[in-house]
């Protein structure tokens, strides 16, 4: 196991010396991204619509759509958005909340609670069951609502129902939303639902669409922090490759831990854990099956943790990732890492000015590649099934 420890420069918060990862090509000059610090609330990194300064007198509010708005995830999410956790403490928002007609009364209750919180950043709430009203001029769309898989339901039947839902929402994005709208799909199967919406929003850039794998990344980083015995905030750059499903590929080979084993030091995750058997035989299945484990324990799917992941995904996308860090987002493949073009696939990305860029040049070992091939196969099969219904 390669040992590599660097000391942090306390003045600049940047790391000195060579990159510790052989998989990054060796020295600092070849590393595909810098290791180091950086601040999230930096106007030079933020999307043009987001205000991160203290002057909010004439700031235009961001219109944020949340679908499935009367559901559990949305209930946790919208209070986080309204309180400034997604766009920062200086950016006002207008919430557009959409749900199906039978949830209209519950939606009214959610609106009352939002009003009762008296959030300074929440300018207004548009709660509706009408898709045109919901999607009109929105800047950010968080598509949480989807048809859940019931007992005995075949995956192709689930895809058929959700293709219908996300076809309609893709068409609504194309027709009513702002041309620069940023779209995050959460409802499962998220990758293929995102692809369906993207294909029906043909006037919008493919780079405006993404699906959520941040929850998987957060789960993985939490497990690593617990295994090593450090704060989760010290664990960085764990990658989730592929589908948001049980074929997802958690990859720690490019991750590092700050202030480990002592303050002021940094060490790669594999040598910090120092247990290849655990990483390969226990850690990966634990991450892959965490959602099912939560359901088994609480008889409900993840809600608060999903909302937290949504906030982190959008915040990093629109405010920018920190220097030396990448995050996992399922985005439209451009062929990187031999992933076929035309899939929504989770990659490591960095974000700047509201645009994501896939991190290039990472070496992938044979074991990880085999798992990536399996998740590619699953996504191709999902796409083929979804397209048969779409067409």
From Swiss-Prot:
Pfam families: Ldh_1_C (PF02866), Ldh_1_N (PF00056). The keyword Oxidoreductase applies. Substrate binds at residues 149, 155, 188, 219. Keywords: NAD, Oxidoreductase, Tricarboxylic acid cycle. InterPro entries: L-lactate/malate_DH, Lactate/malate_DH_C, Lactate/malate_DH_N, Lactate_DH/Glyco_Ohase_4_C, Malate_DH_AS, Malate_DH_NAD-dep_euk, Malate_DH_type2, NAD(P)-bd_dom_sf. One of its GO terms (biological process) is oxaloacetate metabolic process. Its EC number is 1.1.1.37. NAD(+) binds at residues 68-74, 162, 169, 186-188. It catalyses: (S)-malate + NAD(+) = oxaloacetate + NADH + H(+). GO terms for molecular function: L-malate dehydrogenase (NAD+) activity. The active site is at residue 244. It comes from the Eukaryota. Homodimer. Catalyzes the reversible oxidation of malate to oxaloacetate. Belongs to the LDH/MDH superfamily. MDH type 2 family. This is Probable malate dehydrogenase 1. It comes from Dictyostelium discoideum (Social amoeba).
